[in-house]
Amino acid sequence: MILVNTDYISKKELETLTIVKGSTIQSKHLGKDILSGFKTLVGGELTAYSDMMNEARAIATKRMVAEAQGVGADAIINIRYASSAVMGGAAEIMVYGTAVKFV
């Protein structure tokens, strides 16, 4: 499966199939949440949250790819990510794009 954030794939003629998406909501363990709170006092990267967001992006992308495979896509173009805070310590990641087939 080819994944790109452009609206084309060089040297490929494409047939548009449908919009595909994937999402997940992730939260951190309370202990790590408290430790991250202390980290905000001194500054620096909140690695627990960076790791959580990276994991969430991977899960959401995997779900989007599975949906695209289900409709027989060869690639997903124009991929975009969006995130939002759902509640303290939890975030939603959504990824979406256009499933296409090579002609």
Curated annotation (Swiss-Prot):
Disulphide-bonded residues: none
Any Pfam family: YbjQ_1
Signal peptide range in chain numbering: none
Top-level taxon of the source organism: Bacteria
Family: Belongs to the UPF0145 family.
Record-given protein name: UPF0145 protein Amet_0532
Native source organism of the sequence: Alkaliphilus metalliredigens (strain QYMF)
